[in-house]
From Swiss-Prot:
Biological source species: Klebsiella pneumoniae (strain 342)
Catalytic EC class: oxidoreductase
Lineage start: Bacteria, Pseudomonadati, Pseudomonadota, Gammaproteobacteria, Enterobacterales
Catalytic activity: choline + A = betaine aldehyde + AH2; betaine aldehyde + NAD(+) + H2O = glycine betaine + NADH + 2 H(+)
GO BP of this protein: glycine betaine biosynthetic process from choline
Catalytic residues (UniProt): 473 (proton acceptor)
Pfam families xref list: GMC_oxred_C, GMC_oxred_N
Entry function: Involved in the biosynthesis of the osmoprotectant glycine betaine. Catalyzes the oxidation of choline to betaine aldehyde and betaine aldehyde to glycine betaine at the same rate.
Protein name (record): Oxygen-dependent choline dehydrogenase
Gene Ontology cellular component list: membrane
Molecular function via GO: betaine-aldehyde dehydrogenase (NAD+) activity; choline dehydrogenase activity; flavin adenine dinucleotide binding
Length: 554
């Protein structure tokens, strides 16, 4: 089999590339996905409110675990990643958050990455998006990704939480993806007007599936990239239960879009990485590139949970006898509780003046429950997810076996810097202050977790060690740049090699301030133009907020 391009991974970036590259009818593309189809009648992936379900099994989730995390009481922590058409956009929380403009401007300070500034990237965010309330300078109106903005009249706890943030002295913002991210306001979500999850399989691949120049292979587990000297010439994979490898040739390029955990694994299995690691597994070294799998970053978060004195939380929706009605409303009308991910309000703040842009993120949820659906509180409650955004801690992803079925060694080194501890102590104390504002007086009962007895630095630190969880935002393991630990250049081309690029969240030099999916899609759109040899979209001229010396709160 011969194709112009072979794309490894049908996730948030891979599906963008597959769709855009096959717009050229003379360009042939093979899209390889280790998981299965995105079954449209499976409520677990299609109903926004059911977002916890895909994380509980292994049909749609790689269900990785970390090595024992040394600063987290040696816990092995979850590292869920999407498996199936859509990748992690098939199982994520559907929060549409782009990050802060300053994140991208910070990337662009590095020589060679100047074209990754916010104003260079904003046109690609807009190109990808159709926002239900219409386009403007910041939002698109005819892109493949459906974005829904929360409407007035939703759960009263959302507005109360936003108002509480404002009463605590922080700004209100009408659009966390617009002029000003900093502050509290409604949180957009990737949900269609029919109340379905807007994964990239639905938004992008649905346009492209019927094209004769696109071949999609599911249950196709990539073993390695085939090199002739320093040039990538093809891919070898295992299909279904077969132990006999399948092969295809790439006439132009191999595009690695397997995500921050799998992309470095595939490079390492292909002979690209740290030679000392590769020799442990008798892998012939194609290219010495020590940064492959290093620079691993993530967002860590905690839940602060409260009893709700008014019966307005989603607790009744957790009772089995209420779920048939909720399911029917969603299935036949695309409406009701089932049509929302329930993360409809949130915010970004600076915990201290030393931070030039927000370093803490909030998600508000009108029920007290773990993200993966476990440990639901057996009463009306609500919670605030809070976590730091740009931890200096760095980890790695490293092979443990040549077997493509084997999971790698994943270590984030969560909380390995004093800044991490300072930020999380500040976050808990600020959150308690917000939760004690008048806007929440009629709703706020006792603090369920951590509990009011948890006050000192030592007590807060122990709570974080035992209870903080991943926000499922790994990135950075094939970082873009030109220093000795960079893996790809500003166009995604792997340093020292020909015919192979990485296009996914692994190329982010530094993690962004917010959820990763929207920016990963943007990366796919921007790289698609580069791969096609097109001129970049004209830079935006939109204004954006820079705090400068502004106080962190009134």
């Amino acid at each position: 089999m011969q194709f112009d391009y072979i794309i490894i991974g049908a996730g948030s970036a891979g599906n963008v590339l597959a769709t855009r590259l096959t717009e050229d009818p003379n360009t042939t593309v093979l899209l390889l996905e280790a998981g299965g189809p995105d079954y449209r009648f499976d409520f677990r992936t299609q109903m926004p409110a059911a977002l916890a379900y895909p994380l509980q099994g292994k049909r749609y989730n790689w269900a990785y675990e970390t090595e024992p995390e040394p600063y987290m009481n040696h816990r092995r922590m979850e590292c869920g990643r999407g498996k199936g058409l859509g990748g992690s956009s098939l199982i994520n929380g559907m929060c549409y958050i782009r990050g802060n403009a300053m994140d991208l401007d910070n990337w662009a300070k590095e020589p060679g990455l100047e074209h990754w500034s916010y104003l260079d990237c904003l046109p690609y965010y807009r190109k990808a998006e159709t926002r239900d309330i219409g386009p403007n300078d910041y939002h698109g109106g005819d892109g493949p990704v459906s974005v829904t903005t929360p409407k007035p009249g939703n759960n009263p706890l959302f507005e109360a939480m936003v108002t509480a943030g404002v009463q605590a002295g922080y700004p209100r913002t009408d659009d966390l993806n617009g002029y000003q991210q900093e502050g509290f306001g409604p949180m957009d979500r990737t949900v269609t007007p029919q109340g379905r999850r807007a994964s990239t399989a639905r938004g992008y691949l649905d346009q492209a599936r019927g094209r004769p120049n696109l071949t999609i292979r599911t249950h196709a587990l990539t073993d390695h990239i085939i090199f002739a000297g320093k040039r990538a010439v093809g891919v070898e994979w295992l299909e279904g239960e077969s132990t006999i490898p399948s092969k295809a040739t790439a006439n132009k390029e191999v595009l690695l879009c397997a995500g921050a955990i799998a992309s470095p694994q595939i490079l390492q299995r292909s002979g690209v990485g740290n030679p000392e690691l590769l020799r442990q597994f008798d892998i012939p070294v194609v290219h010495d590139l020590p940064g492959v799998g290093e620079n691993l970053q993530d967002h860590l978060e905690m839940y602060l949970q409260y009893e709700c004195k008014e019966p307005v939380s989603l607790y009744p929706a957790l009772q089995w006898w209420n779920q048939p009605k909720i399911g029917a409303e969603w299935l036949f009308g695309g409406t009701g509780i089932g049509a929302s991910n329930q993360f409809e309000a949130g915010g970004f703040i600076r915990s201290r003046a030393e931070f030039a842009w927000p370093n803490i993120q909030y998600h508000f949820l009108p029920v007290a429950i773990n993200y993966n659906g476990s440990n639901a509180v057996k009463e009306h409650g609500f919670q605030c997810h809070v976590g730091s955004m740009r931890s200096p801690s760095r980890g790695h992803v490293r092979l443990k076996s040549r077997d493509p079925h084997a999971h790698p060694a994943i270590l984030f080194n969560y909380m390995s810097h004093e800044q991490d501890w300072q930020e999380f102590r500040d976050a808990i104390r600020i959150t308690r202050e917000i939760m004690n504002q008048p806007a929440l007086d009629k709703y706020r009962g006792r603090e369920i977790s951590p509990g009011t007895e948890c006050q000192s630095d030592a007590e807060l630190d122990e709570f974080v060690r035992n209870h903080a969880e991943t926000a499922f935002h790994p990135c950075g393991t094939c970082k873009m740049g030109y220093d000795e630990m960079a893996v790809v250049d500003g166009e995604g081309r792997v340093h020292g090699l020909e015919g192979v690029r990485v296009v996914d969240a692994s190329i982010m030099p530094q993690i962004i301030t917010g959820n990763l999916n929207a920016t990963t899609i943007m990366i796919g759109e921007k790289m698609a133009d580069a791969i096609r040899g097109r001129q970049p979209l004209p830079r935006s001229t939109a204004a954006y907020y820079v705090a400068g010396g502004a106080p962190v709160r009134r």
